């Protein structure tokens, strides 16, 4: 049986913290959970703007310490996939935010199911998207 590998975007991580049942179920079923540097950057920026920065960083550190959680690398192959997705979405008139392109490209590159609460990822070809709470 193939391992269940998922990637969280920022919205899914936030939903997880809020106790979203669909996201929690997806994470419980996953053997490997990935985030990428873009997601981490968005989280850290959000923490800095909120009133619980220290506590939120501590919670994230605990999450990242799990042996099931890994950081997916962004490299030249990711950039090529980014360009292909962006070109496709432009041609369809359905662009998505730049950071979300990087997240989708990373999921595509590593064959990861993308867990999100953002429905616009459904417009991205060649990735499996599980939209929770959309």
Name these PLM-found stretches.
Residues 1-4, 104, 108-134:
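Acidic, PIN/NYN-like endoribonuclease modules and their adjacent C-terminal/linker elements
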Residues 1-36, 45-62:
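Short, well-structured N-terminal submotif of metal-dependent ribonuclease cores
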Residues 9-10, 43, 82, 107:
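Generic structural signal for small/hydrophobic residues in well-ordered secondary structure
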Residues 12-13, 39, 78, 102-103, ...:
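Alpha-helix capping/helix-boundary segments
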Residues 32, 70, 128-130:
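Conserved beta-strand segments of alpha/beta enzyme cores
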Residues 40, 57-60, 79, 100:
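A general structural signal for well-ordered alpha-helical segments in protein cores
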Residues 50-54, 89-90, 131-134:
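Short, hinge-like loop/turn segments at secondary-structure boundaries
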Residues 70-115:
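Active-site neighborhoods of divalent-metal-dependent phosphate/nucleic-acid chemistry enzymes
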């Amino acid at each position: 049986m193939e391992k269940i590998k998922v990637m969280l975007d920022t919205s899914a991580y936030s939903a997880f913290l809020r106790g979203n049942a669909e996201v929690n179920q997806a994470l419980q079923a996953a053997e490997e959970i990935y985030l990428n540097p873009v997601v981490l950057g968005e989280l850290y920026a959000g923490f800095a703007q909120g009133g619980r920065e220290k506590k939120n960083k501590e919670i994230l550190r605990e999450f990242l310490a799990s042996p099931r959680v890994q950081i997916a690398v962004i490299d030249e192959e990711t950039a090529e996939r980014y360009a292909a997705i962006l070109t496709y979405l432009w041609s369809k008139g359905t662009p998505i935010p730049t950071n979300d392109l990087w997240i989708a490209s990373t999921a595509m590159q590593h064959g990861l199911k993308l867990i999100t609460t953002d429905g616009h990822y459904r417009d991205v070809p060649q990735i499996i998207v599980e939209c929770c709470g959309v």
